[in-house]
Amino acid sequence: MKLIIFTGLVLFAIVSLIEAQAENEKPCLAQYQVCTHAPGNCCSNLVCDCYGRYKSGARIGRNCFCLQKGVIYKRED
């Protein structure tokens, strides 16, 4: 009986370890991918930059994208 309980606990620990490892290996978001709902998922050389959207002076939303660290984007007319 003790052997069955011990075996069950070992199997549970192994399955938990495999699931935790799979969770840590999620693919990162590439450059220009939307990161509005996942700001920490950009690849290591990128940062999640967010921009407000406005219409007639009123804020209507927010967009976030994975962009290169240290790069400044300027609007061109």
Curated annotation (Swiss-Prot):
UniProt keyword annotation of Signal present: yes
Signal peptide: 1-20
Entries under InterPro entries matching the protein: Spider_toxin_CSTX_knottin
Post-translational modification summary for this protein: Contains 4 disulfide bonds.
GO CC, any one term: extracellular region
Tissue-by-tissue expression: Expressed by the venom gland.
Principal localisation: secreted
Coiled-coil regions listed in the entry: none
Any one GO MF annotation of this record: toxin activity
Keywords assigned by UniProt, alphabetized: Disulfide bond, Secreted, Signal, Toxin
UniProt KW Disulfide bond keyword: yes
Residue stretch(es) of the prosequence: 21-26
Membership in a protein family: Belongs to the neurotoxin 19 (CSTX) family. 08 (U8-Lctx) subfamily.
Name this protein carries in UniProt: U8-lycotoxin-Ls1e
Origin species: Lycosa singoriensis
